Curated annotation (Swiss-Prot):
F-box domain mapped to chain residues: 54-101
Pfam families: F-box-like, WD40
Recorded name of the encoding gene: Fbxw2
Protein name: F-box/WD repeat-containing protein 2
Oligomeric form and interacting partners: Directly interacts with SKP1 and CUL1.
Modified residues (N6-acetyllysine): 298
């Protein structure tokens, strides 16, 4: 049939076909299919898929495709990536979807990075790490051996761990290698804090001392307490050292001169923790940038002015129970915005701007958890048998790690958390290094470390 004649015939057939009922149209199609050969059937098969199975990701504008993808969970999205190259390309290009998926896992997000494929890879890495935490496979352990008597003082900073012992020595360890960097002769150590040049120690001999790492020389000796010194902190910027003691007193010292500037009284129990920290919020009594002095005993947390006024008064006292029926656990967290402490009733979080209790986090499945570290996303907790990670958004325990029979001091000085940045959200790089350290009955130090990504 000539082309012109064919087009005329086709037009006539089309007019007639459109006048048929649906049933007649179906019968006509069935008859035509029965008359078709292999070439016609293959043509029909190829075109039916396009007509009947519309690929919305391929046909819709990219903005609408991204909007639809935001309603799917990440695991479904990963499955959809396997449908076709086109689907994989579109889904892997949706930055917001993968950033949100990472945020929901508690990972820190840099919004300036808009590379969708980067965030998809971060998500895949994140779910692997979260699976390891869930399956108790995210950590590994190690030991530091070198002391010959009990170790009751630990302090960690930037990959270095300081240990103070009753063997009259303090050692500085490189956690990554397990090697002792410095070892100096001291007095008995109940508390330690260090920087690159110096070590400050609080002792059971009722004094505080400052030592030089490089020479081991004692550069300053602070005398005045009448009980063991359980906690120390200092600021080079202020040239101030603070100490808390079993004599119920907090003392403020001139760091370089060694003279006592003030004695703060008001505690009726051992002062087990002192913290010198800059305020990050405008509070009722402080402005951002002001230095804050906190002290804690087994019942109360006190906030003090930093000055030289004699008989200066405590600015604020925080407690869990007015009748002292509930004790505070020894570890105290203060980051300039929030004060957090654990008790038998759970974790208490105070807003430093108002001193109000923001929330009480209870863990009914595990009682009497002690606080090690607290962040925006995670908290690190422990008891006599396990180390726990809590997701603070859901207040649920998402991981635990077994601990050996360690030496747990009532003051909280013989155990500590390591790197803390991951508590504000993992980012694929900060889940390295030390997680937890504690002294052992055999005088060694037990370390829990992040296992490298597999």
């Amino acid at each position: 049939m000539e082309r012109k004649d064919f087009e005329t015939w086709l037009d006539n057939i089309s007019v007639t076909f459109l006048s048929l009922t649906d049933l007649q149209k179906n019968e006509t199609l069935d008859h035509l299919i029965s008359l078709s050969g292999a070439v016609q059937l293959r043509h029909l098969s190829n075109n039916l898929e396009t007509l009947l199975k519309r690929d919305f990701l391929k046909l819709l504008p990219l903005e609408l495709s991204f909007y639809l993808l935001k309603w799917l969970d990440p695991q479904t999205l990963l499955t959809c990536c396997l449908v076709s190259k086109q689907w994989n390309k579109v889904i892997s290009a949706c930055t917001e979807v993968w950033q949100t998926a990472c945020k929901n896992l508690g990972w820190q997000i840099d919004d300036s990075v808009q590379d969708a494929l980067h965030w998809k890879k971060v998500y895949l890495k994140a779910i692997l790490r979260m699976k390891q935490l869930e399956d108790h496979e995210a950590f590994e352990t190690s030991s530091l051996i070198g002391h010959s008597a009990r170790v009751y003082a630990l302090y960690y900073k930037d990959g270095l761990l300081c240990t103070g012992s009753d063997d009259l020595s303090a050692k500085l360890w490189d956690v990554s290698t397990g090697q002792c960097v410095y070892g100096i002769q001291t007095h008995t150590c109940a508390a330690v804090k260090f920087d690159e040049q110096k070590l400050v120690t609080g002792s059971f001999d009722n004094t505080v001392a400052c030592w030089e790492w490089s020479s081991g020389a004692r550069t300053q000796h602070f005398r005045g307490h009448t009980g063991a010194v359980f906690s120390v902190d200092y600021s080079d910027e202020l040239d101030i050292l603070v100490s808390g003691s079993a004599d119920f007193a907090v003392k403020v010292w001139a760091l370089s001169a060694g003279t006592c500037l003030n004695t703060l009284t008001g505690h009726t129990e051992w002062v087990t923790k002192v913290v010198l920290q800059q305020c990050k919020v405008k509070s009722l009594l402080h402005s951002p940038g002001d230095y804050i002095l906190l002290s804690a005993d087994k019942y109360e947390i006190k906030i003090w002015p930093i000055g030289r006024e004699i008989n200066c008064k405590c600015l604020k006292t925080l407690s869990v129970s007015e009748d002292r029926s509930i004790c505070l656990q020894p570890r105290l967290h203060f980051d300039g915005k929030y004060i957090v402490c654990s008790s038998a009733l759970g974790l208490y979080q105070w807003d430093f701007a108002s001193y109000d209790i923001l929330r009480v986090i209870k863990t009914p499945e595990v009682a009497n958890l002690a606080l090690l570290g607290f962040g925006d996303v995670f908290a690190l907790l422990f008891d006599n048998h396990y180390l726990y990670i809590m997701d603070l958004r859901t207040e649920s325990l998402i991981s635990r790690w077994p601990l050996p029979e360690y030496r747990k001091s009532k003051r909280g000085s013989s155990f500590l958390a390591g790197e803390a940045s991951w508590l504000n959200g993992l980012d694929g790089h900060n889940d390295t290094g030390l997680v937890f350290a504690t002294s052992m009955p055999d005088h060694s130090i037990h370390l829990v470390l992040w296992k490298e990504h597999g």
